[in-house]
Amino acid sequence: CRKSLLQAVANLPYKGGNTLTGMALNFIRQQNFKTQAGMRPRARKIGVLITDGKSQDDVEAPSKKLKDEGVELFAIGIKNADEVELKMIATDPDDTHAYNVADFDSLSKIVDDLTINLCNSVKGPGDLEAPSNLVISERTHRSFRVSWTPPSDSVDRYKVEYYPVSGGKRQEFYVSRLETSTVLKDLKPETEYVVNVYSVVEDEYSEPLKGTEKTLPVPIVSLNIYDIGPTTMRVQWQPVGGATGYTVSYEPVKTTESTKPKEMRVGPTVNDVQLTDLLPSTEYEVTVQAVLHDLTSEPATAREMTLPLPRPQDVKLRDVTHSTMSVFWEPVLGKVRKYVVRYQTPEEDVKEVEVDRSRTSTSLKDLLSQTLYTVSVSAVYDEGESPPVTAQETTRPVPAPTNLRITEVTPESFRGTWDHGASDVSLYRITWAPFGSSDKMETILNGDENTLVFENLNPNTLYEVSVTAIYPDESESDDLTGSERTSPKSGPRNLQVYNATSNSLTVKWDPASGRVQKYRITYQPSRGEGNEQTTTIGGRQNSVVLQKLKPDTPYTITVSSLYPDGEGGRMTGRGKTKPLNTVRNLRVYDPSTSTLNVRWDHAEGNPRQYKLFYAPTAGGSEELVPIPGNTNYAILRNL
């Protein structure tokens, strides 16, 4: 029989033409694997396809029908055959049922393997009844349970065979005849397996009870984030059976920089880690994956936001003025580097002040008056800046000057003095005008001045005065107003005539009020014995010496004050010159044969000259010697 079979195979013709593999598969299904074609009942059905090219018709459907009818297909490709097509035709697993060689001579290289695999498939067909009703349950990512119904006849044991549909090592083990269920372990996650269960009696095997099932994916980790701080958080997950480790990755959800997630790997016994060096007030996405050798589970992802850094508390704004306010806050526990105080108006950019960590207050200066300020205080740490704590306050109106005082009033002027409203006044604007007049005078003073002399005023006129403070932000205070009347024009007072001589009188008076231009002095003998004479002196003087007067004569003297617009007033007094006086106490002494010494007391007044007359008592001519008025002695010689 063996000889005739080999002879029949050797005589098989090699027919050229089209490659219609699908048609050939349909042919053997319809013509060969039939009892009427000579197939023995319960015989193993094995088909071996040998082709040297890619089929021109469909092979998937015909090969599937054959497999569904229990035919075990081997596919052998030579030279131009399509390897993908061969694996599609062949029964799983591919490594024992699909072959591809470069040419016909290379067929010898696969003969041994092919023979073994064919023989293994042929073994034990007989009449042994196979198990039935294959049920696969209790699926996990690493295992599942296989159950079956035993055959009606007793068996010695069961053989369980399994391998991945996609190809891989075929594994098998035996189960006691008393068991009708077993668990396949150490499977690959999310992998479809072929399962064959055989009845075994001695060395005879039944047809396999076939089935397929897919393991579950690696379980998704049950993830929990807790114990969250400003820069840390803890991550915990439910352990996964069979895991060889875990990968924890994390990154901010929103970031301005393109950065890779940070990652840590931990062993299979660790299911709780702390993430450190995180950014405060930042949402993080945390992903945990279980690692099973070269496989990883689907990622379990959660998001959580770190807490903000501790911020100052109880911010208060006090001591508010038109340009300043003080900021107070409660200190922060922790490693604060400094505090930052920011403030702004709705129209201005933010300004900021840095404050040493040892202080909990600061003053804001140069603020705008009557303006709403938003003030915030933040604590700065090595890790970043805390959220701000804010407060609002409106600055006060700029203060006006106070206590306007008018002094030194004259007919043409007076002095105004006031107290500063604040220390930061830039300028003062002062206006004045007669009461009711719209024609106002104005001047500007520096902010450190607080007095002004108002000049060129009209006598006996009520004036209104207004003082306005102007501040650095150009805000103006309310007006400080006052009024004062200038003095009326006046004449001199308290006229005195004194220090009379035989030809002069001294006149003195108290000055008239206001800005006197001149004083006019008129004088003449009281009895009308001479013409009236006039002299003028400057307005700053208040005395004059009238000279070249007549001796022993009473004089009437009038002093008038002269203002720019006329005479202010006058005052009259009287004085009398002294009579002319001769010398007194004339003495002649120290005579000699030709000289005499003469001495006298000065005459009153201011004599310009003395005339000394002398003559012999016995008779003779009289001699005259002129003597200067400041000398009161002479020596008469040549007597």
UniProtKB/Swiss-Prot annotation:
SUPFAM superfamilies: Fibronectin type III (SSF49265), vWA-like (SSF53300). PANTHER family: FIBRONECTIN TYPE-III DOMAIN-CONTAINING PROTEIN, TENASCIN. Trimer of identical chains each containing 190 kDa of non-triple-helical sequences. Belongs to the fibril-associated collagens with interrupted helices (FACIT) family. CDD domains: FN3. Residues 130-219, 220-310, 311-401, 402-490, 491-585, 586-639 form the Fibronectin type-III domain. GO terms for biological process: cell adhesion. It is found in: Secreted, Extracellular space, Extracellular matrix. This is Collagen alpha-1(XII) chain. Keywords: Cell adhesion, Collagen, Disulfide bond, Extracellular matrix, Glycoprotein, Hydroxylation, Repeat, Secreted. Type XII collagen interacts with type I collagen-containing fibrils, the COL1 domain could be associated with the surface of the fibrils, and the COL2 and NC3 domains may be localized in the perifibrillar matrix. It comes from Oryctolagus cuniculus. Residues 473-496 are annotated as: Disordered. GO terms for cellular component: collagen trimer; extracellular region. PROSITE patterns: FN3, VWFA. The triple-helical tail is stabilized by disulfide bonds at each end. Prolines at the third position of the tripeptide repeating unit (G-X-Y) are hydroxylated in some or all of the chains. Residues 1-114 form the VWFA domain.
